[in-house]
Swiss-Prot record:
This is Elongation factor 4. It comes from Chlamydia pneumoniae. Residues 7-188 form the tr-type G domain. Belongs to the TRAFAC class translation factor GTPase superfamily. Classic translation factor GTPase family. LepA subfamily. InterPro entries: EF-4 (IPR006297), EFG_III/V (IPR035647), EFG_V-like (IPR000640), EFTu-like_2 (IPR004161), LepA_C_sf (IPR038363), LepA_CTD (IPR013842), LepA_IV (IPR035654), P-loop_NTPase (IPR027417). PANTHER family: TRANSLATION FACTOR GUF1 HOMOLOG, CHLOROPLASTIC, TRANSLATION FACTOR GUF1-RELATED.
Amino acid sequence: MKEYKIENIRNFSIIAHIDHGKSTIADRLLESTSTVEEREMREQLLDSMDLERERGITIKAHPVTMTYLYEGEVYQLNLIDTPGHVDFSYEVSRSLSACEGALLIVDAAQGVQAQSLANVYLALERDLEIIPVLNKIDLPAADPVRIAQQIEDYIGLDTTNIIACSAKTGQGIPAILKAIIDLVPPPKAPAETELKALVFDSHYDPYVGIMVYVRIISGELKKGDRITFMAAKGSSFEVLGIGAFLPKATFIEGSLRPGQVGFFIANLKKVKDVKIGDTVTKTKHPAKTPLEGFKEINPVVFAGIYPIDSSDFDTLKDALGRLQLNDSALTIEQESSHSLGFGFRCGFLGLLHLEIIFERIIREFDLDIIATAPSVIYKVVLKNGKVLDIDNPSGYPDPAIIEHVEEPWVHVNIITPQEYLSNIMNLCLDKRGICVKTEMLDQHRLVLAYELPLNEIVSDFNDKLKSVTKGYGSFDYRLGDYRKGSIIKLEVLINEEPIDAFSCLVHRDKAESRGRSICEKLVDVIPQQLFKIPIQAAINKKVIARETIRALSKNVTAKCYGGDITRKRKLWEKQKKGKKRMKEFGKVSIPNTAFIEVLKLD
């Protein structure tokens, strides 16, 4: 790989809300810099998963190195693409830490949206040079003057020289490249000679093993070096090869130098060994201090995943193991359920992360699976002072020994057109939200700041927000603190037998309505038996809702033609005794559709 003067290197990222054209602009930049040959070009080149293309989102960060001749000088432009969704905000923050600048892409028709706002604030915290770009200016609904004013008023960026572009037609792309070179500062010349490299991602390749994506801050990294991860402490690894993204990961000779972005492979066994945000240094001459900002990624949302056919358990285990190779944030623990059999308790960064894993298992491994209702981590403080972290209703202790329960809360920003304000306030009130402030984004739109329990967000908040705002509302959230809450375990009993798959942890105020809706749904989906089946929702053995599935009645007197009524009475009495015995010893078979229908309530 050609060596570049550090002042000719530009590391930048692209910040955009879902569907504002981030991947398409990346495509145009690759075309304009001749990084990709025309015959290899396709839409959303950096989005390698089918799921990313279909949903129009970036799930996994994809770096790429471009070379560009500008005013007689050759520049190396490193685009460190980032996932846009709030679930992956820590990965976004680490990717932004590897950059000196960012393009803020805003749809010229839709304007500023919640997730682009959240990521802009992350970039501002890291003192990045932000270049505002208005995309889709070829749309009839585009209003560049109003949207530019919105960016200036709410984000505080100077939009005097805002770039208007259309990724579809290629208009404005040369202006973006010029702005990257002129406005994004080059990497700072290192003050020390020891190797310091920021890990901003990792990828498992079936042929070469784990590839660690790094941005070199100081020192040099080359094949044969022995390196250590400073946060992991302990193990030393030999670098077996280094490479760059041209745009595909390509092995190179020589070394990775300060300011450059690339990857290395070493004798690493598991993705878990590589932590995003960690600092790589040499084992013999280590850096004195690691780079700032590292933290462990912990799952926020938990759900059980079970195969519909129990014989698929080993296939599901293999599928989750393979997905975990490329996703260190996914946690897996084997568990068993009385009603669903053997499965796994999985931890995710958020609801989108859960949906993506669920969909990939179905698509890539052709498995039929059930996911239990998503849950969060509650802190249960016992009377003896011990604190338990509970993410599964089955682990909830006896209420008699509980002092109190604390639940996680989040800070939420909602952007909405003005006319839907009352709808959103009613929705947030129903979700136990606390309004912090309301601000005007422009003449037509508002920004609402709320505090909400995380449990209310992970169920159906996004769907309901889209519903009450006719699709125009958007939101992002960040984790806040734990607060005391009246959280209780709701049990569902079928024929007086508790069914663990339907149990859930809910707020006391919502327990009755939740219990009633589960009972009503089960009455519709469980087939009738020859005996009466009671369906009950209970809290601490006290029934709060009940429905009954009526028995199938067989006409036992069909063969009696007229005659004495006592003969009929004997047959009815015999039937009654049989049904009583059946109720005591009969088993209710619950179809898989019942589990799926109840989970749809979430």
